[in-house]
């Protein structure tokens, strides 16, 4: 969330942020000079992560169960839309407010049956806590009716208008980085550790692989290249967002994303 106002004020020319948060920000700050220019998480990592041994394998198992959800969690914010898309009666779920640090430990201890969170983060946290991987069920909301997109590269529009070639070159570099990371996740994790020596290379490689497979290298991206969006899906996503957010003004897709700095056909990443 911090990236959006910093880019909007010009403190930074580019950033990386959830496009749904950007839509809300522009609704609340009309005319702010910020927009998305490259989609990265074609499927957002919003998920319900549960344990099969506790009876959670799919959306239909959530009624009658205990769900741990941090109130400010991004995945929890989208849960009503996910529930609506799957005909889930939220009133039949016992929702347990939990803190971020206690979310996965409570699931590991069996105090809740599932939690909301980012798919790859919650999954790896559970593995580190000793939960067998074959006991973990990851219910990615994007695979179960959630139309929303995820994180995108955002720009200050005033900067972009004055420095279009720089923005295009930057997006090309981002795409090249992803292409290399997809081809060799081990080398990508090693580069991350070089930047942040405190990071665990094996853990970050696994996190990267999970994100690539579920969120970045989707069927749409394989067919259409990286960076762009499907206009029909984006319109549906904007409409679906209204189930959990009250727009102050009529939403306008053109304000939230532009492909003006992308190559025709997007960036091939595979």
Where are these regions (language model features)?
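Conserved C-terminal helix/tail region of periplasmic/extracytoplasmic solute-binding proteins
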Residues: 232-270
